[in-house]
Amino acid sequence: MNYSLHLAFVCLSLFTERMCIQGSQFNVEVGRSDKLSLPGFENLTAGYNKFLRPNFGGEPVQIALTLDIASISSISESNMDYTATIYLRQRWMDQRLVFEGNKSFTLDARLVEFLWVPDTYIVESKKSFLHEVTVGNRLIRLFSNGTVLYALRITTTVACNMDLSKYPMDTQTCKLQLESWGYDGNDVEFTWLRGNDSVRGLEHLRLAQYTIERYFTLVTRSQQETGNYTRLVLQFELRRNVLYFILETYVPSTFLVVLSWVSFWISLDSVPARTCIGVTTVLSMTTLMIGSRTSLPNTNCFIKAIDVYLGICFSFVFGALLEYAVAHYSSLQQMAAKDRGTTKEVEEVSITNIINSSISSFKRKISFASIEISSDNVDYSDLTMKTSDKFKFVFREKMGRIVDYFTIQNPSNVDHYSKLLFPLIFMLANVFYWAYYMYF
């Protein structure tokens, strides 16, 4: 029994030793393979100073950039900015990282902390962040000739100065500008790798309210107190899709104007109906005007195209309400004039009788005076009183004629002319409005 256990133990020991020998040989072969295909990072960075740029003290580092625009998630008129997610790729030469062997190899993103990288920042950026899911979205790749590729995935909110005077028929020009934070033109020079072809993705974007008309790249210089810096500029034009606003604002406001014209076909005597239509359309237009401004900046420097149109519509709606007030007032004046005509005839008869009686009284007094002529016995008070009443009547008649000159003789004509003039003037206003804002 002891002999059998001893034999089994010896066999197990021999098997274990054999496996260890094979494993060590495999590790040696793998290690040799790694050394042949990839340079040792520790050997490559031996004596490497990440705080000094390549060619330190010599020619500036040439950094070539490319951009992929993944998305433009929002464009805010109220904040005057846009938010975009971009893939930023930078390439430069670092002679300290030249190696022999394979064409290139990719390092773990955490090793970027041991290398020199440009201090590129986004000009006019309000806030930016680097994506960290599931790890930091960074890539570092080394090429055998010393070229370094450094890629980042960034979401940034960038300021964009907008001219909203033609809103919503406007075209906005926004920029994405890249520049070195600390290295001026003597240390770092930025360039686009392939000109306009250095930017990709914009032509495939689909935005809610905009269409990207065109874009182009520029290389400019930024003169600041700390030096002269190279700045890369991506400039793109955004044309707003006006169809959305036509359906949301222009069509409802136009329908409200047309609805206000319905009152022209309603009788002047239907006071509640016409008043209700006028007040309702005015309040609806006011609500529409307030709602159109909720998503826009509350500044006094912009009189937008949509404000002009809503102002025109409000003027026509309010004008229709005033038209009924004028027509109804004229109707009341006409009825009052008829009553005054009847009263006038009665007053004329009364004045004639008064004058005749005054003349008769005067004649009688003259006959009495023929018996005994005495100026003290003649009484002119009755005649003077009746004559002043006549002057008052003549004055009222003159004033009445002046008022009648400015009074509408036939109130029904007000509605008749309004049926033609309101639609005609509104159509002419639309022609001038759309021609100006679409083509000028």
From Swiss-Prot:
It comes from the Eukaryota. The keyword Plastid does not apply. Residues 24-241, 291-301 are extracellular. Its main location: membrane. One of its GO terms (cellular component) is apical plasma membrane. Allosterically potentiated by alphaxalone. Allosterically inhibited by pregnenolone sulfate. Inhibited by lanthanum. High sensitivity to inhibition by zinc. The binding of pi subunit with other GABAAR subunits alters the receptor sensitivity to modulatory agents such as pregnanolone. The keyword Secreted does not apply. SUPFAM superfamilies: Neurotransmitter-gated ion-channel transmembrane pore, Nicotinic receptor ligand binding domain-like. Glycans are attached at N43, N102, N145, N196, N228. It is a multi-pass membrane protein. Residues 263-270, 323-419 are cytoplasmic. The chain crosses the membrane at residues 242-262, 271-290, 302-322, 420-440. Disulfide bonds join C160-C174. GO terms for molecular function: GABA-A receptor activity; GABA-gated chloride ion channel activity. Gene3D superfamilies: Neurotransmitter-gated ion-channel ligand-binding domain, Neurotransmitter-gated ion-channel transmembrane domain. Most abundant in non-neuronal tissues including the uterus, ovaries and also expressed in lung, thymus and prostate. Expressed in the hippocampus. It is found in: Cell membrane; Apical cell membrane. It catalyses: chloride(in) = chloride(out). One of its GO terms (biological process) is chloride transmembrane transport. Pi subunit of the heteropentameric ligand-gated chloride channel gated by gamma-aminobutyric acid (GABA). GABA-gated chloride channels, also named GABA(A) receptors (GABAAR), consist of five subunits arranged around a central pore and contain GABA active binding site(s) located at the alpha and beta subunit interfaces. When activated by GABA, GABAARs selectively allow the flow of chloride anions across the cell membrane down their electrochemical gradient. Pi-containing GABAARs are mostly located in peripheral tissues. NCBIfam families: LIC. Belongs to the ligand-gated ion channel (TC 1.A.9) family. Gamma-aminobutyric acid receptor (TC 1.A.9.5) subfamily. GABRP sub-subfamily. Heteropentamer, formed by a combination of alpha (GABRA1-6), beta (GABRB1-3), gamma (GABRG1-3), delta (GABRD), epsilon (GABRE), rho (GABRR1-3), pi (GABRP) and theta (GABRQ) chains, each subunit exhibiting distinct physiological and pharmacological properties. GABAARs subunits share a common topological structure: a peptide sequence made up of a long extracellular N-terminal, four transmembrane domains, intracellular or cytoplasmic domain located between the third and the fourth transmembrane domains. This is Gamma-aminobutyric acid receptor subunit pi. It comes from Homo sapiens.
